[in-house]
Amino acid sequence: MHKTDLLEDVYDSEILDRESPESTELAEILKLKEEYDESKSKYQMLSYKPYSYQREFHRAVSDAGGLARQRCLMAANKVGKTYSGAMELSYHLTGWYPDWWEGHKFNKPILAWAAGQSHYITRDILQAELLGEPGDKIQFGKAALPLDLIVDTDRNPGVPNAYASVIVKHKSGMNSKLFFKSYDSGL
């Protein structure tokens, strides 16, 4: 519900007079809340708060105590594995890391792959977590990667609403590149 809808409901119920100081104050509070909600949906990178198992995964420490070159996040269904992976990838692509980040940091742009079993699964799961719901222009850039850091996209011609690659603005001023791949096409 938008602030204007909520305000109209309040006025219609005659709880507040449109001209009262309280009404003006309520309108301002609702406007600030709407701006906050919009910002939060636009910058998921900033609001991600990992669970302890996700935080440990992000630390990327090997059994020997050094930096792990390969990792596997195994957990139950629907507990945030894909989401945490998308958040980590967005940090690496952009170079913008949260204060709590203890894992590896890329100070230069990177070249990365996000791969799934098929192009359709890659689109429906990985692309959705990183860019927003496939085919929904309003939701594009309201996922792990914010719209203002997406420089360019290249469509996957064989799959509706799928991208083959995305260019992402890195903190260094240069650009990272993300490719969407599928295992069934041989990567």
Predicted feature locations:
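Phosphate/NTP-binding elements of NTP-utilizing enzymes
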Residues: 1-187
